[in-house]
Every structure is written in structure tokens, then in C-alpha cells.
Amino acid sequence: MFVDQVKVYVKGGDGGNGMVAFRREKYVPKGGPAGGDGGNGADVVFEVDEGLRTLMDFRYKRHFKADRGEHGMSKNQHGRNAEEMIVKVPPGTVVTDAETEQVLADLTEHGQRAVIAKGGRGGRGNSRFATPANPAPQLSENGEPGKERDVILELKVLADVGLVGFPSVGKSTLLSIVSSAKPKIADYHFTTLVPNLGVVETDDNRSFVMADLPGLIEGAHEGVGLGHQFLRHIERTRVIVHVIDMSALEGRDPYEDYVTINEELEQYNMRLTERPQIIVANKMDMPDAADNLAAFKEKLTDDYKVFPISAITREGLRELLFEIANQLETTPEFPLYNEEELSDNRVMYRFDEGDAPFEITRDPDGTFVITGKALERLFKMTDFSRDESVKRFSRQLRGMGVDDALRERGAQDGDIIRLLEFEFEFID
């Protein structure tokens, strides 16, 4: 089964907790704090494996949770960092954040990697908090939570040339003749439901990858006839070969077919109309095909070359393949997204924008509810079993302006404040 889109959940590993410990040795009174830091949580890294062809594996495993870092230990021993979690994806995979729709990575080359969910930093042990005023601190940090998100994986096939056209115009037959590909061929519409790739070699030893893309119909750019799934595979192609049935046995006018498909490409955007297009007048061995071709050329206003062929008799194929190879030599690649160039094995990570400021709302029962990524991160990294940690958390809230904001909202002594699952009283 060919799977080209799937939604998965990824979570970086949490950082290990820091430790509260003190040096206890004979003849060393008041040895001081000796709690080690926690290790960093593991990143979730997507890596391209050229041996994969579809996203089929993700249909059976959709949750990827990396390991957390090791906790800190006594004697200032730091916890071990967790090893990154490698998730293999096929070439041509585009990773998009499901919530923000931001493209996180476009993975095209073997070995290319992208950090999709960053692991959390390890919490600091109590030796990190020692000061002249507090030489024996009784506080440490919990590990930072790892980044978690839902992402959408889309596979957009890597091909130099894309065959487009209405269903049953002979695209699969053409690919099977000029390459060793074996697409399904039958006398009904939408026989091809997944892209088929084939390597084509010309008589002068030039080669390229050709993709037989499922047939398009009017409204494809809006998703009609699975149009979105089909059109995404054209995005990476450098040359579009537009196959038209000149026999008109389906009862459609060849020129109207041509106009309709080009309108769909234009509406879909992704700069598809900027690519060179070669028109292939197929089924020239059929009756009335020559007359239909003459009428087609009279109506054609675009400056595209038209190649009359018969995929069955192989008439005109040599000239067509030479023209495709010539166009590829002069046509650059069309990048899908404006991204920095990445070396094959470089790990890329797009940092999020700064944490949003906190927000304060009030429930019907009068409870003030505080939300915000920065505050929630501090909360999760606080060890509420230790008084010093709680006092530090209160100071952090005050320093961020939470107390003043609560007063402005009308908070008074004794009012209940909620942050995640933690409730406390407001003291003015």
C-alpha cells in the first residue's frame, strides 16, 4: 500500500531531575552541597533513509516518545544524557506542525536529518544554587519537559518529470514503454491511484526519473477526485509533460482538456505554471486523431512544443525523450520552501518564537487561572516537596509581574490562584 500522508505525535524526552545531596565523609564536617544535575532528554530526530518509499510504517506506529535524561546523583555526579531517537523517513518527506501549519523540515537527501521535538534540559542539583548567603541550599530543579507536538508527514515524490492529464489518456502506458516501470494499466478511469516512478534513458545515454501521476479532473485544486493527494506529487518536478488524448473517444475536446488541466495547475499554485511544459498528443494511431491535432494547434496560444506520439506503436517517442532531456539540462530545481541550504548530515532545528506572555482569566467560581508557556515550564521544573523550591517559584512569579497583574485584575488576600493543577492563595 502506498501511503503519502500521515499524522503522528512526537515528544522529546524530559530532562532528568537535579538532586539535593550533601557531602558526608569522615573528617569533613559541613561538606557542603553535592547534588548533581540531571541529564538532558533525548531529541526526536527524523532521518532520511533512501531505502524507504512510502510512509506505510507510520500507519502502525504513530507515537514517538524519546527517553528522558538520567537523574542527578550524590557526590556531584551528573545524570547521563539520553540518546537521540532516530525515526527513519523516505526521501521527499515534508514535516509540518499540525497546529501552526509551519513547515519544520523538507527532507530530500539520504542521511539528511531534522530535530522535530527537542529534548528538555536536565534540572540543576542543589550545588548549583549555593551562594554565600545560602551555602547549603535545600532546593533543586526538576528536568525541563521535552517539546511535544503533532506533526503531519507528507511524501512528495522525487521525480524530474511529471506526467499530467485527464484519466485514461495513456500516461501509464507511456511510462511503461519508455522505462522498466510496471504501472497498472486498464480501460477505466483512475486505474492509477498512486504515483509510479520509472528511470528513462535516452539513446544518447542521458537519464531522468519520470513520474506517472494519477489522473486529474476539474476541481482537483479543491480536492475533487483526490486532487490534493495527486497534485502534491507534481510539486518537485522540473518539467511537466502534459498528455492529451487526441482520439477524443471519451467525447471531450482535446483543447478543453488542455485548458482545464492548466487551470487546475495554476489554481493549485506552488509555481507549477512556471515549469517548462511539453504537450504530448497521444493516441495518434486512432481515427480522427490527425484532424483533432490540427484543430488543437489552431486554438493553441501558448508557446509550448507539441509532440504527436502513439505509446502503443512507439511513434514519436525518441524525439519526445530527447526534448525532455534537453529541457532538464536547462531547467533549475524549484525549491518548495524558502529554507536555508542544509548539508547532508546536519541536524536542523527551528526554534520556536519567544514564549507568549502569561494570561490571566477568571472562572465562574472566582478562581484566577494563569496560563502561559513560560510559567508552565517553571511550574513543571519546580520540586514542590521542598519549601525552598516553592519560595523560589514564588519569587520567579513576582519577578515576571504576575503578582502585579493579579492585583490589577482585582485579586485580594485569600483568593484562589490556579496554575495547571496547582492551586494556592494570593497574599497581598
From Swiss-Prot:
Domain OBG-type G: 159-329
Keywords of this entry: Cytoplasm, GTP-binding, Hydrolase, Magnesium, Metal-binding, Nucleotide-binding
Compartment annotation: Cytoplasm
Family annotation (SUPFAM superfamilies): Obg GTP-binding protein C-terminal domain, Obg GTP-binding protein N-terminal domain, P-loop containing nucleoside triphosphate hydrolases
Domain OCT: 350-428
Residue segments, region Disordered: 118-145
EC number: 3.6.5.-
InterPro entries according to UniProt: G_OBG, GTP-bd, GTP-bd_Obg/CgtA, GTP-bd_prot_GTP1/OBG_C_sf, GTP1-OBG_CS, GTP1_OBG_dom, GTP1_OBG_dom_sf, OBG_GTPase
Residues involved in Mg(2+) binding: 172, 192
Chief place where the protein resides: cytoplasm
Location of the Obg domain: 1-158
Summary of subunit composition and partner proteins: Monomer.
This protein's name: GTPase Obg
Gene: obg
